[in-house]
Amino acid sequence: MAADYYQLLGVARDADKDEIKRAYRRLARKYHPDVNKEPGAEDKFKEINRAYEVLSEPETRARYDQFGEAGVSGAGAAGFQDFGDMGGFADIFETFFSGFGGMGGQQASARRRGPTRGEDLRLDLKLDFRDAIFGGEKEIRVTHEETCGTCQGSGAKAGTRPQTCTTCGGAGQVRRATRTPFGSFTQVSVCPTCEGSGQMIVDKCDDCGGAGRLRRPKKLKINIPAGVDSGTRLRVANEGDAGLRGGPPGDLYVYLFVSEDTQFRREGINLFSTVTISYLQAILGCSLEVATVDGPTELIIPPGTQPNAVLTVEGKGVPRLGNPVARGNLLVTIKVEIPTKISAEERELLEKVVQIRGDRAGKGGIEGFFKGVFGG
């Protein structure tokens, strides 16, 4: 399965264009082949470029968010971007050292953990073969974290409020100073009492136990676009876990797995099937009814059709994802059935045909006739 582009760039799914651009520039400098000579760096650089190529454009990003790689598989190639405005390498060092405490008494500013976006969820959904082709509405059931209705997500008992954390004084972080022969170092870490929120709950909500969220099942109706296939990913916005401390909810990602069909085989937007006809139908030609995903349709078998010939029924394949008006084709492989036993009258007639054609019949049979007709 292809790597997630957001994870490749190290950004959240709701990151804005500037955040994506900054992350891309930082990683591009790190893995650029002229700078990084380690094995695999060039491949990583190409992956980063591809991720930025997709996520930097609103249209391709929207398709990727809804369908995953399948929605952008035709959107350009993993080429290089313009690095003319990348500037110097100074911010690389800022990235390296910005997370550490200061030296010689200088300290990083404390940050309280604010609203946090809820976690994204994944649901694997098995689809019927024809449902994947034509799409439609599907009801699913998910279990996710919902904001507690009693405390409205605060985690505190009714009539009470969270209080300032006594461990960190509301900063959400604690500092520990260490003296060494090289100077003083300050280590900053998340407060273990309030877990970075800066607040602690003394009287916890009876329903959620102070968590601010409750795990609940939920039924959803989602729209399956026509033309999806195994591996297609659908994004259902805001149906992941509820956020913390007033943060937005995450998203639900539905990964589709399509069942196989007994009549048809699928490759992309084309369908394949097999039809068996008699040797006389192959020689003389005929019109017969064949099955399609839309229902029966007429197929013309031309005279002299050879075994394993492939005939095309246009427009009876799979709708193109994102453009259901455009459809693939149904390709029908023709199998010719040669009888193992024939009546005396049929044999007599066939032997006359052999004489007319001048074919040489095998001993006790008319193999030469069939070889002459079908090129065997």
UniProtKB/Swiss-Prot annotation:
Give the J domain ranges: 4-68
Location in or out of the cell: Cytoplasm
The CXXCXGXG motif repeats extend over 148-155, 165-172, 191-198, 205-212
Secretion signal, residue range per the UniProt entry: none
Q: Where is this chain primarily localised?
A: cytoplasm
- GO MF annotation, one: ATP binding
What SUPFAM superfamilies has UniProt attached to this entry?
A: Chaperone J-domain, DnaJ/Hsp40 cysteine-rich domain, HSP40/DnaJ peptide-binding domain
State where Zn(2+) 1 binds. Answer: 148, 151, 205, 208
Q: Name one GO cellular component term.
A: cytoplasm
> What PROSITE patterns does the entry give?
DNAJ_2 (PS50076), ZF_CR (PS51188)
Keywords in alphabetical order, please: Chaperone, Cytoplasm, DNA replication, Metal-binding, Repeat, Stress response, Zinc, Zinc-finger
| Positions annotated to bind Zn(2+) 2 | 165, 168, 191, 194
What cofactor is needed? Zn(2+)
Its BP terms in the Gene Ontology are: chaperone cofactor-dependent protein refolding; DNA replication; protein refolding; response to heat
Pfam families linked to this entry: DnaJ (PF00226), DnaJ_C (PF01556), DnaJ_CXXCXGXG (PF00684)
Q: Which sequence ranges does the entry mark as zinc finger (CR-type)?
A: 135-217
The UniProt entry, under InterPro entries, shows: DnaJ, DnaJ_C, DnaJ_domain, HSP40/DnaJ_pept-bd, HSP_DnaJ_Cys-rich_dom, HSP_DnaJ_Cys-rich_dom_sf, J_dom_sf
Per the entry, the cofactor note is: Binds 2 Zn(2+) ions per monomer.
Q: Does the keyword Zinc-finger apply?
A: yes
Entry similarity comment: Belongs to the DnaJ family.
- Which proteins does it associate with, and in what oligomeric form? Homodimer.
Task: State its role.
Answer: Participates actively in the response to hyperosmotic and heat shock by preventing the aggregation of stress-denatured proteins and by disaggregating proteins, also in an autonomous, DnaK-independent fashion. Unfolded proteins bind initially to DnaJ; upon interaction with the DnaJ-bound protein, DnaK hydrolyzes its bound ATP, resulting in the formation of a stable complex. GrpE releases ADP from DnaK; ATP binding to DnaK triggers the release of the substrate protein, thus completing the reaction cycle.
Which PANTHER family does the UniProt entry name for this protein?
Answer: CHAPERONE PROTEIN DNAJ A6, CHLOROPLASTIC, DNAJ HOMOLOG 1, MITOCHONDRIAL-RELATED
Kindly give the NCBIfam families that the UniProt entry links to this protein.
DnaJ_bact, PRK10767.1, PRK14293.1
The UniProt comment on domains reads: The J domain is necessary and sufficient to stimulate DnaK ATPase activity. Zinc center 1 plays an important role in the autonomous, DnaK-independent chaperone activity of DnaJ. Zinc center 2 is essential for interaction with DnaK and for DnaJ activity.
Instruction: Supply the name of the protein.
Output: Chaperone protein DnaJ
Species name? Synechococcus sp. (strain ATCC 27144 / PCC 6301 / SAUG 1402/1) (Anacystis nidulans)
Task: State which gene encodes it.
Answer: dnaJ
